Amino acid sequence: MQVFLKATHFDFIGRRKPAIYASLFLIGVSLVSLFTQGLNFGIDFAGGTLIQVRFEKPMDLAPVRQAIAPLDLGDTVVQSFGTPEEVLIRVEKQGADNAAQQAIVSGVLDALKPIAGEHGVEMRRVEYVGPQVGEELTEKGMLAMLYAMVAILIYISFRFELRFALGAVLALVHDVVLTMGFFSVLQKEFTLVVVAALLTVVGYSLNDTIVVYDRIREEMKRMKRQPLATIINEAVNRTLSRTLITSLTTVLVLIALFVLGGAVIHDFALTLLFGVGIGTYSSIFVASPLVLLMDPGSRRKVAAETAEETP
């Protein structure tokens, strides 16, 4: 791939309009879905019951899931916790009072006894996540992304220029909105794990964008007499092989995680798979054209070209 992409001369800026229209369409679909059917919040945000148990021997998670499935506890997450003997069970169902909560815990323990063997199962911890806690986690998750965006805006403003910073932040907003829209359209469960993956996507996409922006800045010094559109095209083409090879190797690892990682890491890997693809696209077709659009001279030229195309 390095050989084939070493000296590419694609006109990315000349083809920016179809990419912009595609992005606007996908953002529109995402926003409509987010505002109409919203996100399918998991136990972390919607509330539920958390039960930590210990078996005397290492326990496979599949029998645990099968044992508690008939209890009708809503969305259920089962994962190892620390050691193979420790299992963490999170269920959507909440008790209206203490008696109902105890009934849920007792039902889970009774369901696990047949698979625990003669040594039985020991309850180590029980926590109840109410709706108020879920709302607090939602607020903190959104604030974490907002603070990340502000910090990125400040950093790139100092590192490059304000137009680069605005382009990077808008590209990141593009990535986050499309990823959240993906979860909303498919009604995939949205948990704290997905929020962590979203922040990882932001970091990955930003890294791709900064590599392109750094090359644009270097080309601006080297090609002082050239139009900005030509400079951006040259910079994107020079970084194209690095961008695609990095994304490809990352995707291969994520596919392995998605296929082999099990149910616990499934949503994390899925979020990153989608986010890395969108982030690679945005660093080439969104972040770079935004630098052109935010340049005063280029804006006037773009406006003139648009006027000439209009009959």
Swiss-Prot record:
A single BP term in Gene Ontology: protein transport by the Sec complex
Major location (coarse): membrane
Pfam families in the record: Sec_GG, SecD_SecF_C
Keywords: Cell inner membrane, Cell membrane, Membrane, Protein transport, Translocation, Transmembrane, Transmembrane helix, Transport
Gene Ontology MF terms in the entry: protein-transporting ATPase activity
GO CC annotation: plasma membrane
InterPro entries: SecD/SecF_arch_bac (IPR022813), SecD/SecF_bac (IPR022645), SecD/SecF_CS (IPR022646), SecD_SecF_C (IPR048634), SecD_SecF_C_bact (IPR055344), SecF_bac (IPR005665)
Positions in coiled-coil regions: none
Quaternary data: Forms a complex with SecD. Part of the essential Sec protein translocation apparatus which comprises SecA, SecYEG and auxiliary proteins SecDF-YajC and YidC.
Family classification: Belongs to the SecD/SecF family. SecF subfamily.
Identification of the protein by name: Protein translocase subunit SecF
Organism: Magnetococcus marinus (strain ATCC BAA-1437 / JCM 17883 / MC-1)
Native organism taxonomy: Bacteria, Pseudomonadati, Pseudomonadota, Alphaproteobacteria, Magnetococcales
